[in-house]
Design a protein with these regions (language model features):
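Generic recognition of cysteine residues
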Residues: 16, 27, 37-39, 64, ...
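A structural signal for well-ordered alpha-helical scaffolds and beta->alpha junctions
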Residues: 13, 17, 94, 117-118, ...
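N-terminal capping segments
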Residues: 1-29, 176
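N-terminal propeptides
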Residues: 135-179
Length: 179
């Protein structure tokens, strides 16, 4: 279910979009990556964003740091226009193979491998990284460091990474997680 901005996320909520937003905040990219806790609402923000954009064509080859949206009800017979159910961040691209870091993948942070234009792809959020090339971020990152951080913020094991623990504590202090 889509949830509005300003919504205090609960532990029982799906948290894939919240994860993408938390990574964007941690990397100082909230001005080019729409922040939201629901997939469809995040797509709406990409569609109306001043510099970043929504790409409906799931056959494009995204770049590391782009945001991929899924529709688990996709039949695989043509362009999918259903509601997005899940979201992650492209971590690497090799030919037509994508690796995507996802929060709420079996209730943890993991990496998924899939093909460009594969079944379940809904579309892509394309952050305007080019606007960051001459600017320093809140965390003094240049564009290359921002992309590196964005695509490496996940721990694929069962033990939470130090970053995940720090992010969780931050979210609790700021009231983002509401028990």
């Amino acid at each position: 279910k889509p949830l509005a901005r300003g919504y205090a996320v609960k532990y029982t909520d799906a948290w894939c979009a919240t994860f993408v937003s938390a990574v964007a905040i941690k990397c100082g990219l909230s001005d080019i990556m729409p922040l939201e806790c629901g997939c469809e609402a995040m797509i709406s923000l990409y569609r109306s964003h001043a510099v970043s954009r929504w790409e409906e064509d799931e056959s494009i080859t995204p770049q590391p740091g782009d945001v991929v949206f899924y529709d688990w009800q996709d039949s695989g017979s043509g362009d999918d226009r259903g509601a997005a159910d899940h979201v992650g961040i492209v971590s690497s691209v090799s030919g037509r193979v994508l690796k995507v870091i996802e929060g709420n993948f079996s209730n943890s942070v993991k990496e998924r491998t899939l093909e460009v234009n594969g079944k379940y792809l809904r579309g892509f959020g394309l952050p305007a990284y080019y606007t960051k090339t001459d600017n320093k971020e809140d965390f003094d990152m240049d564009i290359n460091e921002a992309r590196k951080q964005l695509t490496s913020c996940a721990d694929t094991g069962d033990t939470p990474s130090a970053w995940a623990e720090e992010a969780a504590e931050y979210c609790k202090r700021k009231g983002i997680f509401n028990g």
